[in-house]
Amino acid sequence: MGVLMTERANLVFHNKVIDGTAMKRLISRLIDHFGMAYTSHILDQVKTLGFQQATATSISLGIDDLLTIPSKGWLVQDAEQQSLILEKHHHYGNVHAVEKLRQSIEIWYATSEYLRQEMNTNFRMTDPFNPVHIMSFSGARGNASQVHQLVGMRGLMSDPQGQMIDLPIQSNLREGLSLTEYIISCYGARKGVVDTAVRTSDAGYLTRRLVEVVQHIVVRRTDCGTIRGISVSPRNGMIPERIFIQTLIGRVLADDIYMGPRCIAIRNQDIGIGLVNRFITFQAQTISIRTPFTCKSTSWICRLCYGRSPTHGDLVELGEAVGIIAGQSIGEPGTQLTLRTFHTGGVFTGGTAEHVRAPSNGKIKFNEDWVHPTRTRHGHPAFLCYIDLYVTIESEGIIHNVNIPPKSFLLVQNDQYVESEQVIAEIRAGTYTFNFKERVRKHIYSDSEGEMHWSTDVYHAPEFTYGNVHLLPKTSHLWILSGGSCRFSIVPFSIHKDQDQMSVRSLSVERRYISNPSVTNDQVIHEFFSSDLSGKKEGRIPAYSELNRIIYTGRYNLIDPAILHENSDLLAKRRRNRFIIPFQSIQEGEKELMPPSGISIEIPINGIFRRNSILAYFDDPRYRRNSSGITKYGTIEAHSIVKKEDLIEYRGVKEFKPKYQMKVDRFFFIPEEVHILPGSASIMVRNNSIIGVDTRITLNTRSRVSGLVRVERKKKRIELKIFSGDIQFPGETNKISRHIGILIPPGTRKKNSKESKKLKNWIYVQGITPTKKKYFVLVRPVVTYEIADGINLATLFPQDLLQERDNMHLQVVNYILYGNGKPIRGISDTSIQLVRTCLVLNWYQEKKSSPIEKTHASFMEVRTNGLIRDFLTINLVKSYISYTGKRNDPSSSGLIADNGSDHTNINPFYSIYPKERIQQLLRQRQKKNQGTIRTLLNRNKECQSLIILSSSNCSRMGPFNDVKYHNVIKESIKKDTPIPIRNSLGPLGTALQITNFYSFYHLITHNHILVTKYFQLDNFKQTFQTLKYYLMDENGITYNPDPCSNIILNPFNLNWYFLHHNYCEETSTIISLGQFICENVCIAKNGPHLKSGQVLIVQVDSVVIRSAKPYLATLGATVHGHYGEILYEGDTLVTFIYEKSRSGDITQGLPKVEQVLEVRSIDSISMNLEKRVEGWNEHITRILGIPWGFFIGAELTIAQSRISLVNKIQKVYRSQGVQIHNRHIEIIVRQITSKVLVSEDGMSNVFSPGELIGLLRAERTGRAFEEAICYRTILLGITRASLNTQSFISEASFQETARVLAKAALWGRIDWLKGLKENVVLGGMIPVGTGFKGLVHRSRQHNNIPLEMETKKNNLFEREMRDILFHHRELFDSCSSKNFHDTSEQSFMGFNDS
């Protein structure tokens, strides 16, 4: 007894809680020490003990045991507070929807996680024996996350698509859920239930496919004799120790391992836990192990390459079906991957980035040159550091150094005061190369209806040149300017023109009479005019019949509805993505329109011209034809425009053919009549017959000219041409043959006609050979066009009005629109323009400045009493000078809006500048902006005039009284010429900048004299009474605001509201017309401006703002719709593309594995293995040349892709806590990667190109033939691999049975019944386990015959040849390999183990 006591005392007393994992470890240790039988006895005792204790405990569970965590209240409140701030930022347009979604998810995820951690400590302190607590951490059933849902908060749910719902469930199941929360949680739960069902079936199918790929892999030898291995290093910190141990245990060493001179392990020794520990303690060299990858054969595996059997811990037995075990070990946990979907479903894993916190209070300092300002993924401003950044924090003489790793975000500014534990930097979550990321698109929809507006340049995506998909080049705002369109009950026509003002009453009147069609015309007019439009009633009311347009005081134009659509002053045709605007000026008060001269100005939709682009074109009526025909230039030189300097950028509009620049003085047009008939039409004339005028061709068409008929049948239609002209029968066929299809100039004699006469005109000779009749020649008349060189600016525009100044340059170029000999088809009655005269815009610059490549054009319409004028402004302003100094220099800080967003439209001059600085800036700007304004207006009725102004005749006003501008006053002011005073009319966004409301306006008075005065506050008021002034809005349309009426623009009911300023001298916020103002930006002394919008009118004491909503869009987002398009509520505005990491996403477990095994690349950016494989292939072949390149390239590629595939699959399983031994995955990956694809070149006599063959087989064939096979590696998915095996019976029993069997029959394939499945299908004994020996003997008998033949022939080449062709036959080396001594047999075996 005493002895027993002393033994007890020597034992280790283990006072620890044993949970599931500890239990697993204990059992494995027990098996190692005592073996199976003894362990089972011990475990029986443990079981009995457990049941006794559980009976004594008698745990019960009541609702009172669910204790809510006390800190939950303030945690939730805090999260709500953060969400509220976020919502505000989103509303102001500082953060866009994706950033908002990300951040709100992370806020709630963090709250939920914190609560979960609190839960455990809370229970431990308040009630350690709480049954809920005991159960949840017992490891038996249920886990912390479920208890968390009972007593913490349910947290975030995913919707059925796996996307997060950003409304968290704040209650837990103990408190009960509200109705909304209940519905959201049903979403999640339903998803869970459905998932479980669906994914169980998925996992089952995955298992089936996996087993299909590897069912034939059986352990058939002890050693394949390979010398290769995969190296694993314990010193490399990449692999955690746990994974390192898992990788090594049960493997076999491929090489001896030395520790200094001493050998601590030898080749072919299997690795146990003792050996692994020794490796770790000794920090040994890299360890080379044998894996299924290194085994020499593809269709079986040897004991040493497989290693220990997982069941009993010894080397695997011969005849073990390791393939099927591997398939099932990967497929079966698939069901577990699915069962864990819905506890924390779909949380962004990127959510928990590491933070760097300040060690103490103090001022932070770092080198600003090493950081780069950027936006974090939440939309916060931050600095990105590219290299290790050392940050110092000074506090009371103590200096702390903090090191921030590269690619981190720094969240504080230089010299900022930070508090202790404040987050100063965020380290990006480790970016693995194999981090699964997917691209997600998020559409943002409009909340209100209105007009679309961009605040920066947006460019077309190149692939959608003509579509409405635009990409954003930088972060900017999109604005929806509010306003609803009027919808009418019947055909909408409006009496008002664009930008007219009208009172609300008149709008309703218009609606009333339009919806009541029985009202007569007279009543309409009467009612319309008597309804007191703007308080004054004047003008004769003519009868409706005689009026074409009613002339009414100043602002109202009444247009007869019938002609409304034809003569609106700017008839803009949309052609793909340009506006083509024919100019017709309408002189009010005249009945007839001016004849349009045909000059059309063409402006790209985004308003940007590049150099040498076409500004306007003029279709000369002399070059119009009404009939179809062919153009010929004869032999005269004409070349397509490709020369660099002649290159005109012209996006081919659909109906324009490629242009040919004319170096031609004349060209010819050969008319012909063409009828295009449907293929089914019955034609009443024969081919090659001659008909007269007005002959019936088909039932309802008649010919317009007489001549020869040619009928051509195209695919679905018939082309019938009638050539007019004389027919000549030449005497000698060979002589005339050179005249076929040529032009003959006048003055040539006709030789073959009886009387010789000179030709008056050009003719075209065309030979025609009918089938039976005599050969004849058709002589056709030709229309000759001379191209006048005289067309230049002077002929288009009168010389006295044409002034080219400074740097702008217009050039006239003629283009023939059709190529030489190209047939031209006129459609029904339209006329065909043969030559187009284009105005090409170009500009020069001083050599010093950087060249401006593009210019902005915009249109304005100015309307004064009785006359409408259109301006086209083109300016070369590159960009406004924005002046920002270093951040710590307070004297020159740029303007930053209060809420931290960056405004693109606010002029960067701000009151912090000293005055001299501004004047200096203004002078600089004057030198820089070389602007040009062209005015098109009709001075007299006959011609259009074009005035070219340039920066020399425009001058800029500064807002200061001490700056004197003399040049403006001296300038002679022409009557009738409104010159805009500023030339910084930008792209359509910023029209005219008005500083402080009074520095200058664009003033046009009634008597057409341009008045320019600079008003200070005092004398502005008296001039205000006498002047009617006009303002430009953001579209460059000038109109007259009337401050006393209630303003409504048709067709928008705009939400205007007035904002009164109490102006003082100090108020110097710069408000410019067309500027966008965000919410809560302070523009006046009396508090913040409350709504966001666009400034439409700036008046002495108030500003009119059209309310607008900003949407932030970041770089690379896609904008839908065009600038100025009217959007309705719910239309798509923007599409964001953002990356979301998928790796740890629990919902993504099984599909991810399947995606990797099937080698699909669904939306996965960082991991597209197939592309990598191709890349590796190409590089290596390029470096090493052909034969070696293919051999080594394939080897390396396969090795690379195998390792990465194994890592990817393991990563998914480990993230779920499922442990699978690498060797199972390796067996399957080996099958996916063991095939190569034969290329086109070389080896055509053995393999056909595109054939899939095993890599080993390709190498051996190459060695036997001593010539290179060109092949490249290919990754097959498991389904394709199952359909590309050596056994057609196995393939047919998997998928596509009929196809596989038919092919096998045609090719005469032989199935050697190697695998398990073939034998099962045919009812034979399967070649594993006990059936394995039988197979060996059978294969011996099989192979006797060829062996005997081979010993007679000593020709090695023939023998190798035959081995390759009969490569299916294999010998299996069981333990009886000692019998084989004969060399020929040995060589045969060596070749036959594929």
From Swiss-Prot:
Keywords: Chloroplast, DNA-directed RNA polymerase, Metal-binding, Nucleotidyltransferase, Plastid, Transcription, Transferase, Zinc. Its cofactor is Zn(2+). CDD domains: RNAP_beta'_C (cd02655). It comes from Vitis vinifera. Belongs to the RNA polymerase beta' chain family. RpoC2 subfamily. This is DNA-directed RNA polymerase subunit beta''. One of its GO terms (cellular component) is DNA-directed RNA polymerase complex. SUPFAM superfamilies: beta and beta-prime subunits of DNA dependent RNA-polymerase.
